[in-house]
Amino acid sequence: MWRFSGRRGLCAVQRLSCGRVHHRVWREKSDQACERALQYKVGEKIHGFTVNQVTPVPELFLTAVKLSHDNTGARYLHLAREDKNNLFSVQFRTTPMDSTGVPHVLEHTVLCGSQKYPCRDPFFKMLNRSLSTFMNAMTASDYTIYPFSTQNPKDFQNLLSVYLDATFFPCLRELDFWQEGWRLEHENPRDPQTPLIFKGVVFNEMKGAFTDNERIFSQHLQNKLLPDHTYSVVSGGDPLCIPELTWEQLKQFHATHYHPSNARFFTYGNFQLEGHLKQIHEEALSKFQRLEQSTAVPAQPHWDKPREFHITCGPDSLATETAKQTTVSVSFLLPDITDTFEAFTLSLLSSLLIAGPNSPFYKALIESGLGTDFSPDVGYNGYTREAYFSVGLQGIAEKDVKTVRELVDRTIEEVIEKGFEDDRIEALLHKIEIQTKHQSASFGLTLTSYIASCWNHDGDPVELLQIGSQLTRFRKCLKENPKFLQEKVEQYFKNNQHKLTLSMKPDDKYYEKQTQMETEKLEQKVNSLSPADKQQIYEKGLELQTQQSKHQDASCLPALKVSDIEPSMPFTKLDIGLAAGDIPVQYCPQPTNGMVYFRAFSSLNTLPEDLRPIVPLFCSVLTKLGCGILNYREQAQQIELKTGGMSVTPHVLPDDSQLDTYEQGVLFSSLCLERNLPDMMHLWSEIFNNPCFEEEEHFKVLVKMTAQELSNGISDSGHLYAALRASKTLTPSGDLQETFSGMDQVKVMKRIAEMTDIKPILRKLPRIKKYLLNCDNMRCSVNATPQQMPQAEKEVENFLRNVGRSKKERKPVRPHIVEKPTPSGPSGAAHVSGSQIVRKLVTDPTFKPCQMKTHFVLPFPVNYIGECVRTVPYADPDHASLKILARLMTAKFLHTEIREKGGAYGGGAKLTHSGIFTLYSYRDPNSIETLQSFGKAVDWAKSGKFTQQDIDEAKLSVFSTVDSPVAPSDKGMDHFLYGLSDEMKQAYREQLFAVNHDKLTSVSHKYLGIGKSTHGLAILGPENSKIAKDPSWIIK
C-alpha cells in the first residue's frame, strides 16, 4: 500500500433517574507490563541485543525500552503497556532515486513468498490463518514499514516468523515481480493475436492513485519543494515510469535496503519482550553481519529566492463551478524533524494558523469567498526529513492565484504583529491533553505511525513520545517570551526564501494526454521486441496464468486452529436508567482514563420527506453556525476549550430480524475531560434549544467545503459508493443510505453549492430542528469511570430537562412503525440491568426489491465496481454462513481472479449487518470482465469446491474481525445503537462456529445468482462502449 500524507496528531481525536442506577466497582487498570519493563538495566544483554535506555512515559501509561543488536546494529524500541492488542513492525529506510516505484513494488513482492515459506502469497494466506487485528505493509516517501497486531501470543509468534522471513529472505521470483509490478502481456493471455498491453497490480494501483487531484497536487508539492534527493521522485511509482523497472533492479534494491543495519524494529503491548528478541535474533538477525549504510537522506540545500511552478490535472466532473477549479498553495521548508521540540512547536503553530474558524488563515482564505476549501496537504507536514508548512485554496478562479498569494503574505504579517489569543493557545493545549488520555483500540499502530518518520532519520522516538515534557517546555518558552510564536512565524515564514508557490488547473485533455503517453511508451516497448521476445512474453503470460490458477499448497505456513478461538466473548455490564421521566440512558462504566463519552440518538420518523436529502448537511453545520449567545467563532472556541469534539451524523440502523425494517435517526457524539462535563452538556443544551441559522455567509462557506470534500473523496472510496448505489433498490434502508451517504448525496451537495441564492436551503434548517432537536424519541449513553457516573447522571438529567419536548404530538411520516424493546432479563440480556430501551423502527410491508444497474461515467482510468445481493438479516442463522462464505470467496477465488489475474488493486466479497452481500473491486482496469468473475465466483461457491481447511481459515479470518478490540469509549455501542445484546452476539458466535460445508453450499444456492430482482449493480469509471449499448444500464 502506498502512503502519502502529512503527519497526524498523536492519537487523532475526531470524536436524577427514575430507577437509580447501581454502579459496580471497577478494578484499577494494571500496570504490570510497564513495571516489568522497568526492571531492565542499561547495558544488559538479552538474546544478542543490548539495552540502551529504559524510560517511563507516564502520560501514555507505558515504559519505553531502547535496544540495539550487537552484530548488525539493528535498532529496537519496545513500548510496554498493559494492552493485549500487541503490535510488531519492522521499518526500512527506502530512498529511491527514480519514479519506477521500486520500494513500492518491492513491498508487494517480498510478501509473495520466502525461503521458509515458499508458497505463493503467504501474506494474503496468513489473513486466513491468523486472528490478527491488523496486517499490512506501507510504502512512504522514504521508508517502508511492515506492521501487524494480534491479541493471541501464539499468533504473534506465527506472524512474526512470516514477516521476518518475508522481509529478510524473500524469494523475489520473476513471475511475482510481473504480477505485482508490471508486465507486458496479451490482452487475452491465451490468444497471441490480441494486442500486448501493460498489466500489474502496482501499475494499476498508481493509475488509480493519480485519479485523485489532491494527490497529484500533494505529490508535485513535495517533489518541487524538496527537489535535490529522494523526495524529488514518486516513491509509489509514476505509471509512466514503472515500466522502466527491471527485476534485477528490484533484487538489488532489496539487497541494499532490506538489511538489519538499515532496520528499525518496534514492539508494543503486554507480551514478554524477551520472547520477541529471541525469535528475531534466531530467525533473522543472527544470519547477518553489520553493513555500512548508504541510505541517509541529506539536508535539502536552501534556496536563495522563492520559486513558482504550475501543473495540470484531470477535470473534476463534480466540481461546483467549472470556471473555478484552480488550486494554489504557498509552502515553506522548515527545520529537521529530528529536532523534536522545534517540530512539536511548529506543529502546534500550524494548528493555530489553520485550524477552525478562529484561525488567521481560515478568516483570510476560507472566508474570502475566493475558493471552496484549503488546498491539499494544508498545514504542518512532518513525513520528510525536513518538515514543511503549506497553505492555500482550492476551487478558485485562475485569475485569483495572485490574490491568494498576497492574502497569505498579508496574514503572515498580521500574525507577526498581533500574535494569538491566550484562549486559542489554551484550547490547543487542552486538545493535546485529551489526545493523550483518549484510548483507541489500535494504540500500538497509532504509535508506530507517529514515530516512524522521526526515527527513520535517526531522531529519538522516546523523546517524541514524552508529550508532557514537550508541553512543559512550550509553556515555559511562552511565559519567558510572550512573542515566542510570533518570532517563529517571522523566522520560518516571513524571512524564509525556501518558499514555493504551486498552482494547478484542470486540463480537459489531461487523461487523454496521459493515455497517449502510455500508448507511446507501450509502442516503444513493443517495437523493440524481436519475434523471439514476443514468443517469450506469450509463454511467460501462459506460465503466470498457470501459476495463478494452480492450487497452492500452503501447508508450510503456520496457522492457528479454530480451537484457538475463544468459545465465548467477554460480556459488558450495562445499566439502563430513565432520565427526565422516561428517556432511556445507557450507562457503561469503563476505565476511560478520566474521559467522559456522551452520545444521544434522536429519531427522524416524523421528518417530512422533502427535508430528508439535506439531513447530512444539517448535521454537518449544526455545531458550526453558533448557538445561544455564542456566534460561530465563539462556539468553535468553547468546543475546543471544553470538549474533544462534538459531532452530528445521520444513521440508518438495520433491524436484526427483518430486512425491510430499520431505524432512522441522528447520532450526537462528544467527549470531554471529567472536569468539563457540565460545560459540554451546557453546549449541547444550547445547540438543541438555540441553534443559530442566520449566518448566511458562513453557511455558504460550509456548504462549499462539504461539497468539495465529498467530490474529493470519490477516487479513494469509489468501491463504497458503488456498493451503496448497487444496494439502493434492494431494501428500504439501502435507499435511505444512498440518500444520506451515496452518489445521490454528492449530487445534492453539488446542486446546493451551485445555487446563487442559498436562502431557501438555510430556511429549511429550522424546520429540521423542530422535528429533530427534542426529547420526543431520544435515547442517550454515557461511557465513563464508575466514580464519574453519579455526576454524569446528574448532568444528563439536567440536559434532558432543559431540552424539553414538542408542544404537539407529531405523527410519523411513514405510518408503519414497530416498537422494539432491547432484550432484557436473565434470558435476553443478563448483563443489562435497569430499564429497557424501546426503539421505534420503520417497516415497509409493501416494499418490492428490484434490479438497478448504474454506470457513473467519471474521468478515471480505472473502475470501482459493486454488485449487491439481498440475503437475510443478522438474526437469521443463514447470516453466519453467508459471512463465512464471503470470506471464503474472497480468499479462495476472487483474490486470484480480480487482483492476481485481473490486476485490480483490490476486490472481494463482504456481508453487511443489514444482510446485503456485496462483491466489489477497487482501482480495477476491467469492468465487464470483473462482473463475469463475480458470476464465476458464485458458480464456484455453489460447486462446493472447497475443503474443511478452507472453511476453518475463513472462520479464523471472520473471527479476527468479530473479536477485534473495542476501545473503552465504544463498549456497549452495539446494544445502544442496534439493540444487540451480548447474548445475541454470543448466539451469532456459536452460529459461526457451526458453519459447515453443507450450510455454505446451501446458502450459495439459496441466495446467490437466483434472480435479478434481488441483485443490484453499479460501476464508477471511464466510458464503456459495451455498457453504453446495453439498455438495461442507467448511464449517469
UniProtKB/Swiss-Prot annotation:
Residues engaged in binding Zn(2+): H104, H108, E205
Outcome of mutating G19C: In strain: LG/J and SM/J
Catalytic activity, EC: 3.4.24.-
Result of changing S17I: In strain: LG/J and SM/J
Annotated region described as Disordered, given as residue ranges: 806-833
One Gene Ontology molecular-function label: zinc ion binding
Post-translational modification: A disulfide bond locks the enzyme in the closed conformation preventing substrate entry into the catalytic chamber.
Compartments it resides in: Mitochondrion matrix
Protein name, as recorded: Presequence protease, mitochondrial
Record organism: Mus musculus (Mouse)
